[in-house]
Amino acid sequence: MEESVGSRGGGGGGLDAQIEQLMECRPLSEPEVKTLCEKAKEILMEESNVQPVKSPVTICGDIHGQFHDLVELFRIGGKCPDTNYLFMGDYVDRGYYSVETVTLLVALKVRYPQRITILRGNHESRQITQVYGFYDECLRKYGSANVWKIFTDLFDYFPLTALVESEIFCLHGGLSPSIDNLDSVRSLDRVQEVPHEGPMCDLLWSDPDDRCGWGISPRGAGYTFGQDISEQFNHTNNLKLVARAHQLVMEGYNWAHEQKVVTIFSAPNYCYRCGNMASILEVDDCRNHTFIQFEPAPRRGEPDVTRRTPDYFL
């Protein structure tokens, strides 16, 4: 039987019912969220900054509150725990269903801790979520900021990176001039708000670039890094590939740096208007890669929301 926190002491039934409810896009109550996040914290605090992951696994990029597209992702990729998943951050903000999206992923983590890995993205932060929608959504759905606080406190425990079979390094953003090797990542103190600068910030904010070397990022955080940097990093750490998310790519995935780096983006028709495909990357037992592209799930009536979020695409 799949070992899980939910199944210990007979608690799985309640959690399974909650997962079923969440799959129908119905949020949990505030006390249920609090209990769930307490259990999740116990699991996540035991995980490494470079969390080891075995194949087969399906690697996913940004979701951004596009709940119905996450359900479509599970329909196409296989449901958890039949398929192992690795999500590379940015569960919240921009889409209309950040609450349901992040609650479902955390519930799956608690129920099947060995089957799903959830990394931190730059949007899993107190500051960013106050600007881009998650904070306002929590206020609207729960009447107070309590659930926002519960989740943003939990985000501090999400692992920063994962390592699939010692050869695919997965993270939300990209590389850092402060980090040459994986041990430098392992030694970071991650349990904090995402800093404005430094190695932890860079891992969640940086982007690959056509220009060599390190560059100043137009995002105002992190760096751009060239093919020379990726090649050196992969060589030093015996890696085949860096897989990351963080950037909208129209086909859902995009190779860079002569296939040393791949961007995976899993929110189709991003912000309900970009017209992009989404994709997920399946890594099988033999470590072969297959990209699966998908289009948006059929649109539901979107909730009546006053949009006051800036248009700058983080």
UniProtKB/Swiss-Prot annotation:
InterPro entries to which the protein is assigned, alphabetical: Calcineurin-like_PHP_ApaH (IPR004843), Metallo-depent_PP-like (IPR029052), PPA2-like (IPR047129), Ser/Thr-sp_prot-phosphatase (IPR006186)
Residues binding Mn(2+) 1: D62, H64, D90
Record GO cellular component, one term: nucleus
GO MF, any single term: protein serine/threonine phosphatase activity
Cross-referenced PROSITE patterns: SER_THR_PHOSPHATASE
Keyword annotations of the record: Cytoplasm, Hydrolase, Manganese, Metal-binding, Protein phosphatase
CDD domains the UniProt entry points to: MPP_PP2A_PP4_PP6
Annotated localization: Cytoplasm
Cofactor list: Mn(2+)
Active-site residues (renumbered): H123 (proton donor)
UniProt family annotation: Belongs to the PPP phosphatase family. PP-2A subfamily.
UniProt keyword annotation of Transmembrane helix present: no
Metal-binding in keyword set: yes
Entry's cofactor comment: Binds 2 manganese ions per subunit.
UniProt-annotated binding residues for Mn(2+) 2: D90, N122, H172, H246
GO biological process, one term: mitotic cell cycle
Record protein name field: Serine/threonine-protein phosphatase PP2A-4 catalytic subunit
Name of the gene encoding the protein in the UniProt record: PP2A4
Main location: cytoplasm
